[in-house]
């Protein structure tokens, strides 16, 4: 039973010490439910065997911990002799070579050792002597360690059949043939082929087979450029004609689409594959050249698909995350060690509201980054060592052994299914050419490339092995190659006439379209106030046994109820709750992500309440009755911008019917995610025809908080938009940027995101001081049916015939200007607010200015410095399209957004507020 106000402010009992020191959700909230701890005990006979042979057990554990250091997993090693490790010597543990041992309980597998010497050889064969090695001794969970040891030590029992080996060989041959064909027909193209790393095809071959057998329905992949195109062509059903058409100078999209497009190494795949007679959806997310940046995008897209299927905490709890949707990430060796976004992604792996049920990682380890060798590209022994930060197991594999990779892939897949955790495969391979095929790597890596150029290719070595074992004849291998080369030749001939099929606005995007390019559209986003009143009440409703904070009861709950009842002084947080709650009522799910979003940086939102006795979380809107069942997910993020924003972008591109909001703690910190903003959010549609309605809330405003807590860098977002300077914008601009000044405006712009039949990213220059400013409130009439977001707010004070000066501004600066006008009684001055900056609202602005026939001057006033803010954006559009000179009033040029000296700040405020009236 829920209630509004069952507790009096004075009647809240003193609370006992909580069991948990931090807020939590033991009961679960939308998007997160605690996972019950698994019970595991090492069998009694196993413990007895280990205790009775303590030193022998230590010896076995030493190989599990250190054996990887001696494993022959590097196909181009220039090390001439194998080093010795004292930790792997029997004498180190006081053991004699002929001392009898029992392997029961110590080692898995059919092989038996009767003495220490035999055991040593057996351990060397398992952990040092084959094409694979393992690292998992640092995994804290004993069940996982036991599982990994048992399954790795029996890995060789899983042998491939003849037909399976031939399938792998054919894939490797196709990959090599692709690169050979490209080199022959397009010798000057930087194709970033897979030569030297062709074994990765065996990874995907095994992964797809295991996936369908485990009832996986959808695989989402993030992958960099290396080997991307041959994989797409050989295994993922991409027509080679698409690539060849692109290389002839045409677009990868149909001719009616005005897209700027991208290079072939950024092509994506979204296909339904047929594997072992079963259907499997496969999505390779689009990637920029910023390495690893696509990884959180894939994670977010994966979680969105899991949400749509009701997995994990989005359902009844009967199936964990990852039950039917699997996330897979490929890395480059230098990029995985070097790019900080990887640490951020791993840090998110098991965080509530970001978990995806464990990701499967493959590091394609070329052992060089452009020209930089590993010891110059990281401070650790392995490129995979970052994985240890989350205790993810790592398997190292020699790239010359595709069958070993297939076996390890199956093992890694089974681990992910069993424990729903991340796991890594480090594929040690090489890059046959330089960073691209036109680059000469011998300038900087002569010894390595002496080995590379003298050795045969991986596909040829494997084909020779199969021929020797009478599995695949040389003639059959040649036939495979010739047939594929013939097919590629046919595709090349078809390329000029090839028309790419639409790969956008499909499935869940079917009912959407591109935004109109020649007009601004207007959408009624108002609702009946009785419904909004109910939603507002529900936003502060909590259970009878819930122990609310007394201050929140007074200032948040009671205050909101009073505002709703009176229909006046509706503040920012209430308007936000009405927007979100009404979207939920209409059946949309809403997600707010970022640091401290439940409470809000400025303690204004309180969409999440915390029981003061139990620390249990409660989200009132998720208990709202009636409507179509939308839910609110409050995703308190790690202290990261780049990976978190990438994750939210991944969710936004997958489902256009959900509202995805990312809030920066302060707008100043958005630049920590600049790569995601630049290469995905504002450019994804024009490069890839990938729309999104992601909302970025960026708190902004000069209030004396110095340079890092004052500015979201409006000017940078305006520079990124493709608004025109000399003609009117349509809704088709790449990003919509608003600076709303009233709660109702904020309400309408949020609801508009999902009301339209197209999707655009939205940057909201969000308030700080306006959150509690009495003047910055709205009334219930502002939310009623027929109301909408206004791109320009006109002046309601000055009489048009008396106006001699018009001040244009945007954002909270309006309120200081209005206060100054009141002080001066300067009613010959009108103040217009540009609520929308992009698209630039020239029609609405012209309509407002048409009222003022006696204007003598136009002023742009802003609180930002002259080289910042919207001045350089507004001025050319105003002067070109209005035909009048626009004067500037604001702070002078500066290299940093705001002063840290209180006296200087106050003086600047006085000056910039007075200047427009004295000009």
Swiss-Prot record:
Catalysed conversion reaction: N(6)-[(R)-lipoyl]-L-lysyl-[protein] + 2-oxoadipate + H(+) = N(6)-[(R)-S(8)-glutaryldihydrolipoyl]-L-lysyl-[protein] + CO2
Cofactor: thiamine diphosphate
SMART domains: Transket_pyr (SM00861)
CDD domains noted in UniProt: TPP_E1_OGDC_like
Region (Disordered): 298-317
GO terms, biological process: generation of precursor metabolites and energy; glycolytic process
InterPro entries: 2oxoglutarate_DH_E1, DH_E1, KGD_C_sf, ODO-1/KGD_C, THDP-binding, Transketolase-like_Pyr-bd
GO CC, any one term: oxoadipate dehydrogenase complex
Gene3D superfamilies registered for this protein in UniProt: 3.40.50.12470, 3.40.50.970, Multifunctional 2-oxoglutarate metabolism enzyme, C-terminal domain, TPP helical domain
Enzyme Commission designation: 1.2.4.-
Keywords per UniProt: Glycolysis, Mitochondrion, Oxidoreductase, Thiamine pyrophosphate, Transit peptide
Domain of life: Eukaryota
Location in or out of the cell: Mitochondrion
Biological function: 2-oxoadipate dehydrogenase (E1a) component of the 2-oxoadipate dehydrogenase complex (OADHC). Participates in the first step, rate limiting for the overall conversion of 2-oxoadipate (alpha-ketoadipate) to glutaryl-CoA and CO(2) catalyzed by the whole OADHC. Catalyzes the irreversible decarboxylation of 2-oxoadipate via the thiamine diphosphate (ThDP) cofactor and subsequent transfer of the decarboxylated acyl intermediate on an oxidized dihydrolipoyl group that is covalently amidated to the E2 enzyme (dihydrolipoyllysine-residue succinyltransferase or DLST).
PANTHER family: 2-OXOADIPATE DEHYDROGENASE COMPLEX COMPONENT E1, 2-OXOGLUTARATE DEHYDROGENASE
The protein's name: Probable 2-oxoadipate dehydrogenase complex component E1 homolog
Organism of derivation: Drosophila melanogaster
Gene designation per UniProt: Oadh
């Amino acid at each position: 039973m829920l209630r509004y106000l069952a507790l009096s402010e004075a009647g809240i009992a003193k609370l006992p010490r909580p069991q948990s020191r931090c807020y939590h959700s033991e009961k679960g909230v939308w998007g997160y439910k605690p996972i019950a701890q698994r019970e595991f005990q090492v069998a009694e006979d196993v413990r007895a065997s280990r205790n009775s042979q303590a030193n022998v057990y230590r010896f076995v554990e030493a190989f599990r911990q250190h054996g990887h250091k001696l494993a022959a997993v590097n196909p181009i090693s220039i090390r001439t002799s194998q080093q010795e490790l004292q930790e792997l010597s029997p004498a180190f543990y006081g053991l004699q070579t002929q001392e009898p041992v029992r392997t029961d309980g110590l080692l898995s597998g059919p092989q038996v050792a009767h003495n220490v010497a035999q055991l040593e050889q057996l351990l060397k064969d398992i952990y040092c002597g084959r094409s694979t090695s393992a690292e998992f001794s640092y995994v804290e969970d004993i069940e996982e360690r036991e599982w990994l040891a048992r399954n790795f030590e029996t890995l060789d029992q899983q042998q491939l059949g003849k037909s399976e080996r031939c399938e792998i060989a054919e894939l490797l041959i196709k990959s090599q043939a692709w690169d050979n064909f490209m080199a022959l027909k397009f010798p000057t193209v930087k194709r970033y082929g897979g030569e030297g790393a062709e074994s990765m095809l065996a990874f995907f071959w095994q992964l797809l087979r295991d996936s369908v057998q485990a009832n996986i329905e959808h695989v989402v992949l993030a992958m960099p450029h290396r080997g991307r195109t041959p994989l797409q062509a050989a295994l993922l059903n991409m027509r080679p004609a698409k690539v060849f058409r692109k290389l002839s100078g045409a677009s990868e999209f149909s001719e009616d689409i005005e897209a700027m497009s991208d290079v072939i190494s950024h092509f994506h795949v979204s296909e339904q594959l047929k594997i072992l007679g079963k259907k499997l959806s496969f999505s390779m997310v689009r990637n920029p050249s910023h390495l690893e940046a696509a990884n959180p995008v894939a994670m977010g897209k994966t979680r969105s698909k899991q949400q749509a299927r009701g997995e994990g905490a989005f359902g009844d709890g009967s199936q964990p995350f990852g039950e039917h949707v699997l996330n897979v990430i490929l890395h480059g060796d230098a990029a995985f060690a070097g790019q900080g976004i990887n640490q951020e992604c791993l840090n998110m792996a098991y965080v509530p509201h970001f978990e995806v049920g464990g990701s499967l990682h493959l590091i394609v380890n070329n052992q060089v980054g452009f020209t930089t060798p590993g010891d110059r590209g990281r401070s650790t022994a392995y490129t995979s060592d970052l994985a240890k930060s989350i205790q993810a197991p790592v398997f190292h594999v020699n790239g010359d052994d595709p069958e070993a990779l297939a076996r390890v892939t199956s093992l890694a897949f089974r681990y992910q299914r069993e424990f729903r955790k991340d796991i890594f495969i480090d594929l040690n391979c090489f890059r046959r050419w330089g960073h691209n095929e036109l680059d000469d790597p011998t300038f900087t890596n002569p010894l390595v490339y002496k080995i590379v150029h003298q050795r045969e290719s991986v596909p040829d070595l494997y084909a020779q092995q199969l021929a020797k074992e009478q599995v695949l004849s040389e003639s059959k291998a040649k036939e495979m190659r010739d047939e594929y080369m013939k097919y590629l030749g046919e595709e090349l001939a078809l390329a000029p006439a090839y028309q790419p099929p639409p790969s956008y606005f499909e499935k869940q995007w079917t009912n959407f379209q591109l935004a109109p390019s020649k007009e601004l559209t207007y959408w009624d986003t108002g609702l009946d106030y009785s419904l909004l009143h109910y939603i507002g009440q529900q936003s502060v409703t909590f259970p009878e046994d819930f122990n609310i904070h007394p201050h929140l009861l007074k200032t948040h709950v009671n205050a909101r109820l009073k505002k709703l009842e009176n229909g006046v002084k509706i503040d920012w947080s209430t308007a936000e709750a009405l927007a979100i709650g009404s979207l939920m009522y209409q059946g949309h799910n809403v997600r707010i992500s970022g640091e401290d979003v439940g409470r809000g940086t400025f303690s204004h939102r309180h969409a999440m309440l915390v029981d003061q006795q139990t620390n249990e979380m409660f989200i009132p809107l998720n208990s709202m009755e009636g409507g179509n069942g939308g839910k609110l997910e409050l995703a308190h993020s790690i202290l990261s911008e780049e990976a978190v924003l990438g994750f939210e972008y991944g969710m936004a591109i997958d489902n256009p019917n959900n509202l995805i909001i990312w809030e920066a703690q302060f707008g100043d910190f958005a630049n920590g995610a600049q790569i995601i903003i630049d290469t995905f959010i504002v450019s994804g549609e024009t490069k890839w025809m990938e729309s999104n309605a992601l909302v970025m809330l960026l708190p902004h405003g000069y209030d004396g908080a110095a340079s890092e807590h004052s500015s979201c860098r409006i000017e940078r977002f305006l520079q990124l938009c493709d608004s025109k300077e000399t003609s009117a914008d349509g809704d088709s601009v790449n990003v919509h940027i608003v600076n709303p000044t009233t709660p109702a405006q904020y309400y309408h712009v949020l609801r508009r995101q999902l009301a339209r039949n197209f999707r655009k990213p939205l940057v909201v220059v969000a308030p700080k001081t306006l959150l509690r400013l009495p003047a910055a409130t709205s009334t219930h009439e502002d939310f009623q049916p027929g109301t909408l977001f206004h791109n320009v707010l006109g002046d309601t004070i000055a009489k048009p015939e008396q106006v001699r000066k018009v001040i244009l501004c945007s954002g909270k600066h309006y309120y200081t200007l209005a206060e100054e006008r009141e002080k001066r009684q300067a009613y010959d001055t009108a103040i217009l607010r540009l609520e929308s900056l992009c698209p630039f609202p020239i029609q609405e602005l012209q309509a407002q200015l048409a009222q003022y026939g006696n204007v003598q001057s136009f002023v742009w006033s802003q609180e930002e410095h002259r080289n910042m803010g919207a001045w350089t954006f507004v001025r050319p559009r105003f002067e070109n399209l209005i035909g009048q000179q626009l004067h500037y009033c604001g702070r002078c040029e500066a290299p940093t957004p705001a002063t840290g000296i209180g006296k200087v700040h106050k003086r600047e405020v006085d000056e910039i507020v007075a200047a427009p009236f004295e000009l």
